[in-house]
Amino acid sequence: HDLRSGRPFPEFDFPQGQDFDRTVNMTNWDLFFYTRQFYSMDTEFQLAAVTKMLSYPISIASVLHQFSPYSLNPKGPVTLEGLKSLAALRYTLYPLENKTISSTKDRPMRIFILGARAEAQLPGHVWKQLQYLFPEQMFELHFVGPECLLNKEKHQYVTSSTPAVKRVDETISFVYHTDFFHVLHEAQDFFPYDPYLDVFFCFHPGFGAPETSAS
C-alpha cells in the first residue's frame, strides 16, 4: 500500500494564499495546478489522488470564480437564471471591484451542500483551497443531510437536533445539519436567504432515482 511505502507525499503539500498578481486558470486540472503552483505531479497515480481529494472544493470554485470556464455568456452552459445568480455572487466575491458591497457583507457567504456525505468528511485544509481563491471572502459551508456528520471512532453517522459547528480558521467554518433540507427549509432554519450571499450545490442529488419519484 502506498501509505506504508515510507515515501514522502509532496503532492499533498498544497499551496496557500494566491498572490493577487497571479491569475488562476481553471480550464483544466493541469493548468489549475500550474497557475496555483502545486507540486509538479509526474505520475497518473499522484494526479488521480490529488484531483479526487480536491474535486468538491475546486468544482465549487470553478463555478464561482471570475475566471470560471462557465463564463457569463447567454450561450454558455448555464441557464439565464443561473447567469443572474452567478453575477450576484461574484458581485460579493470581488469587493475590490464593487466598492459599494461592503455595506451588505454583514456575514460570511453560505455554501449549502445538500445530501452531503463524502463532502462533509474532507479535512479543513482541503476546503481551505476554496477560500484561498477568494481571499477577501469568509465562508460558511453548510453540510445538509442525515449522513453529513460521521463519528469516526464509532464508524456511524450522528443525528443532532442542533447544528454542529466546526471552525477551521477565521475565514472558513463548517456547519453540519443532520436532517433533510426540506425539513429545515420548512422550519425556516436558514431564513432569510440572500442571492448575494447564499449558494446551493447538489453533487449527488439522485433526482432521477426511482425511489425518489413518490416525493
Feature-to-residue mapping (PLM):
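Positively charged, amphipathic N-terminal segments that serve as targeting/anchoring signals
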Residues: 2-199, 203-209
